[in-house]
A protein has these predicted regions:
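N-terminal periplasmic/intermembrane-space "pro-region" immediately following the signal or transit peptide
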Residues: 1-49
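Surface-exposed beta-loop-beta
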Residues: 179-239
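Outer membrane beta-barrel
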Residues: 34-55, 62-183, 210-215, 219-227
Length: 239
């Protein structure tokens, strides 16, 4: 009891996950290094990614190069017992690119069924929802998560999500509708279908054709052993 009182008197304190055995890949946006602020319902967090590379291509050596690739800030707030807010702001390559990657409100009803809306992360594959650099033991993101699925892909939309907890396993699901990407997915300089080329700033303002895209993912996880899932992302993209 004395130790608990000591922790509560700190202005800033580390927030620990209390149900780590029930965390799946779709929970990664909340399973982050947050610092709580005393007597508030708000927490802040973030990470910095910097690296150095030695470039050599086709016998041509460019030598060493250093880069501050990402500087990300998180803000979390428990507005009420059932309503929580999360945002992520990313500064990439110094300040060359600034993006609001997440700004969502969750209405938590119970473990099996909840509502989510705002700037969300579509559940495509495993990496888009769990893209924070400190979570991975490699410097560059996988090609499948950059050239095929443009992590990080953010969209304006809303939907439902939840988990079914079993003795030794977890079944989780996400189902969203969103503005979706534009016709740049096929009308691009790459002369091929490219989801990254379909991204645009307009997708945060309005749907280019008035027909929402559909995204869904379902996964099965064995506690502390692994997770397998299948996802869908599709709809009408041309205007």
């Amino acid at each position: 009891h004395t130790q608990t009182d000591s922790i509560n008197t700190k202005i800033l304190y580390r927030i620990e996950q209390t149900d780590s055995n029930n965390i799946t890949n779709s929970d990664a946006i909340y399973n982050r290094p947050f610092i709580g602020v005393q007597k508030t319902r708000t927490a802040i967090g973030g990470y910095v990614e910097g690296n150095t590379n030695y470039f050599s291509e086709d016998g041509i050596i460019e030598g060493f190069s250093m880069e501050l690739r990402r500087f990300n800030l998180f803000i979390y707030s428990s507005i009420s017992r059932r309503i929580k807010f999360l945002s992520e702001l990313e500064f990439e390559h110094g300040t060359k690119e600034i993006a609001l990657e997440t700004a969502q409100i969750d209405f938590t009803l119970n473990t099996a069924f909840n509502l989510r809306g705002g700037v969300i992360l579509p559940q495509i594959g495993i990496f888009n929802a769990n893209h924070d650099s400190p979570n991975w033991e490699f410097i560059d993101r996988p090609l499948s998560s950059t050239n095929i699925i443009p992590s990080t892909l953010s969209e304006v939309g809303f939907g439902v999500y939840g988990k079914l907890l079993k003795d030794n396993s977890i079944i989780s699901y996400n189902l969203y509708i969103s503005n979706g990407i534009g016709d740049g997915i096929v009308l691009n300089e790459n002369a091929r279908t490219s989801i990254p080329a379909g991204k645009s700033l307009e997708m945060f303002e309005e749907d280019n054709n008035g027909i929402p895209m559909l995204n869904g993912r379902i996964s099965y996880a064995l506690r502390s052993k692994g997770e397998v899932g299948i996802s869908y992302y599709g709809g009408t993209y041309n205007s």
